[in-house]
Amino acid sequence: VLKNLPTRWDIKWEEELIKTWEEEGLFTTKISGNRPIFVIDTPPPYLSSNRPHIGQTASYAHFDMIARFLRMRGVDVIFPFYLDRNGLPIEVQVEKKYNIVAHEVPRDKFLKMCKEELDSYEKEFVQSLRRWGLSFDYWPDGTDSEEYRQMTQKTFIDLWHRGFIYEAERPTPWCPRCKTALAEPEMEYKEEETYLNYIVFKVKETGEDIIIATTRPELLPATVAVIFHPDDERYKKLNGLHAVVPPEGQVVPILPHRAANPKYGTGLVMISTFGDTRDLMIVNELKLPVRIIIDEGGRIKTGRYTGLNVREARERIIADLKKDGLLIKQERLVHNVPVCWRCKTPIEIIVTRELFVKQVELKEKLIELAAKMDFKPPEYRQMLIDWIKSLELDWPVSRRRYYATEIPLWWCVKRDGSKMPIVPKGGRYYRPWIDQPPEEVKNACVDGEIQGDARVFDTWFDSSISWMYASGFTKRFNVFDKVYPHSIMRPQGYDIIRTWLYYSLLRAYLLHGDIPFKYVRINGMGLDERGEAMHKSKGNVIDLLAPVEKYGADAVRFWAAAAGRLGSDYRYNENVIKEGKEFVTKLWNISRFVLSFEEPAAKPLLTAVDRAILAKLYHTASRVIKAYEDFDVYEPIHLLYEFIWHDFADHYIELVKSRAYNRDGVFSKEEQNAAVWTLYTVWKYSFKLIAPIMPFVTDKVWRYAYGRSIHNESLEDPSEDWRGDYELFNLVKKINSAIWRYKNRKGISLAAPLDVVLYVPETAMPAAMDLKHTHKVRDVRQGKGVEQIDEEGLVSIS
């Protein structure tokens, strides 16, 4: 082998290459100043374990493939990787690990515990992703860094002073376990088996009994109205009357409202403050009084059931109703219960003072802006629009937790108990719960006591400006003004469209009056082999390194691309990884063959067969590049696998081996050079095309051949000289396959001579010499022979 290429590919070279890439600065962001810049707004993953699972890692591999492609296209790519270290995930994890409750531990001690837990995971987390060959620029300053938090606070200060953020006391979804407010997207729904309880109310004016069905009898003391559908003839007579609510006997109005479903229960519905967002809407619409009976810890705080938690109160009230003969019947049913997205505790709606970002009044403008973003695939735009349309409440962004960005807010408490909020100007990172107030805050509080706000931001308030951070907004290479918003791409899963994507859009509009980024690339969820989501509780999480150690990173990346259709879920499939390993071997062996020849210095006169494979390459490459430009890696790997293995290796290489070696001197020197030149041309260009997906084997070979990295090469558009008709090549493939099948049927070795004359169509005659010497037949002629050997009637022999 002229270029000293070893006989076999060795997986151990992958880790050596990672070190080489790091030493050569492949992972470091470089801004040249004279090349286009493109930003990948990499999703900062929650750091809740020392490794991501393989499904999550596959999506990051997709982003890496896009970054590598763009670099080879002459683009300065900002592809950062940092961790989302804020918020409930790490707090809940620390609480569980040490069997503590955050609110019962000194704040500074709890923050230190959270940081130490995060630090213990981060190094291995990053290194495990790097083992897949991910070429991100690792930024150790995650969302909990002073740098990031100062940026978050700066945007809050801007929005506060411009009137887009306000504080108000209002009903808010609340997690009793986490003791914090939640936004709409932070609520999940889980199926729960319960009872529909049929309970007797009395009509105050007539004394008659009416029956109301509810799954939440614990909210009877919080009931403020009873409604029925305006068209329900059974209850029209009750309009304007009042109901006496058991067990505490409060009197509430009976009113018509279209929210009542005549087919559910008895058709009469109790409205409580608050059972769900429907109750909240109706209470606001009808201006009903508010009776809050559940406190921040999820316990009853008024009446005879004071001190009981929600479940205990439900059981006690049911028992009391039964004793009083007011529970008519119970029907078992399964319904969806809103729960906290992190700890899965059922959510209550209570009245608290929170900070809100305006969003409901902006819905029409946000829908208009959603149309400006380029979605890949486009159907996911509608999911975003549908979510915007569904919004009914402004976004509560304050949280009563610890490990998150502090709200830069102080209160001037007057002697009469009134409180005035003071928000300083930006410029540094503020921690009002422990820091002394800045001078401007002191100067603004006359005749009052200054108190620092102890609350923190919803973690989405931080994450929703990741596109600013990724653009170097706080870095030395701040290119925000050059790239915003036209040269930023957000890659993310469809599962966080209503959170990360939506909040990013809202924040961009409020801060800049525009979209946050031009491109939105949506990927599906990584599933196990049975098509189920991977969860520790299910025991089906697949370690991201196990298949890498067994088959190599290129093989696993092959699966990630081959399974990763844009917008669709993708299953783990070890068989596809095995195919990837075989493909690595094929790429290696192709390279060994091509590199066994000296590369021609100049382009010779090509044969028709050579021009045909180049035309097929042109056609394939054009589709591959178009797909890459659409941030798609699924189509490129399938196209390139088919072309490299089945077109180039199986057919073209086999067809021109005799001509390239020319051991018998039957071909002219120019014909021989044409074969070798074409072998090199197709090999080099196809390797550049597949290098973003399979970076290890391609780079190793390239370094043997040329002494440099393939990832620093330029990937130009396919040469216009290659454009042409490749039907000759398709025809030759059919002829080759027909002869090989014939030899198999006859038990003849594929390398053995075949003492026949081969007859082919006239259009195949330009390949006659290559066909003759490849298949070792006596001659190749135009026409029909005695014995047809293929189903189409193209190939016959005599």
Placement of each model-derived feature along the sequence:
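N-terminal, positively charged nucleic-acid-binding surface of large information/translation enzymes
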Residues: 1-231, 255, 272-285, 289-304, ...
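Secondary-structure transition/capping motifs at alpha-helix termini
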Residues: 32, 68-76, 97-107, 127, ...
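Active-site-adjacent bridging/hinge elements
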Residues: 34-42, 65, 100-101, 126-131, ...
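Structured ligand/cofactor/substrate-binding pocket environments in proteins
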Residues: 54-68, 74-75, 83-84, 150-151, ...
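Short secondary-structure boundary/capping segments
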Residues: 59, 93-98, 183-184, 229-230, ...
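Non-catalytic interaction-recognition regions
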Residues: 142-149, 561, 607-611
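Short hydrophobic alpha-helical segments that form membrane-spanning helices or hydrophobic packing faces
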Residues: 170-171, 223-225, 351-352, 405, ...
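Feature 926 captures the class I aminoacyl-tRNA synthetase adenylation module centered on the KMSKS loop
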Residues: 198, 390-461, 465, 510-553, ...
